[in-house]
Amino acid sequence: MSAKIINFAWDFNTKRIMTPKEIRNQRLAEKMIKNLKRRNFEAIYCPTAAEAVEQVSAMIPDGSSVSWGGSMTIRDMGLTEALHKRSLKLLDRDLAADRDEAQRIYREAFSADFYLTSANAISEDGVIVNIDGNGNRVAAITFGPKKVILVIGLNKVAQDVNAALARARSTASPINAARFDIKTPCQVDGVCHNCNSPESICNYIHFMRNSHPAGRHTVVLVGEELGY
């Protein structure tokens, strides 16, 4: 009887044997970090969301001004909750008393020290894809805040930029349309119709090939399924 060879690796941080999925995630992240650094991003990998919260929080000094886009990732992982417990100037539009105050916070975010968000998709070679309805998120990613930190679960990784765009349009956008109960064709059947609906949330398609200036953007890859 031939013996089965089982691949395993020891995690020196957690002092336990890594699962095959954890091994795959780490190897994928290592490859992507190299590609992102070639594109002038700063990049790290966190196996868990809890570790990512600690790492991102450590990047932000007390007294900093911080804002974020409408990201389920950073909310669900507890990052915004952790930041609310610190001595920071938080520009949180969810706390706005009315629409006018929310609009003011949108604009103040462009002067923030740190802007936090996720992405709809990222290719294995490091191109980040986002689709926006209002454009405030992709605008802040592109220009304004001193530092942008993008927290991206490995569930959003696609083989190449075309697959990343397809994921953003066919997975993230229909789910977000359902989340906001927006009356678009994709809300009805879960499929992108490349529509021009008045309520479309796919008005701005953004590809980020490089971080400019170098190091302005930090990508935190997380070995968990986060966001849409």
Place the predicted regions along the sequence by residue:
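Active-site-proximal helix/loop capping residues that flank conserved catalytic or ligand/cofactor
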Residues: 4, 34, 50, 124-126, ...
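Short, positively charged and aromatic/hydrophobic N-terminal segments
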Residues: 4-7, 11-14
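N-terminal start-of-chain detector that recognizes signal peptides
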Residues: 15-18, 37-40, 87-90, 101-103, ...
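Glycine- and acidic-residue-enriched helix-capping/strand-helix junction motifs
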Residues: 17-25
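Flexible, glycine/proline-enriched loop segments at strand-loop-helix junctions
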Residues: 19-20, 94-96, 148-155
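N-terminal active-site beta-alpha-beta segment that forms phosphate/nucleotide-binding
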Residues: 25-106, 110-116
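Conserved phosphate- and dinucleotide-binding cores of soluble alpha/beta proteins
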Residues: 110-228
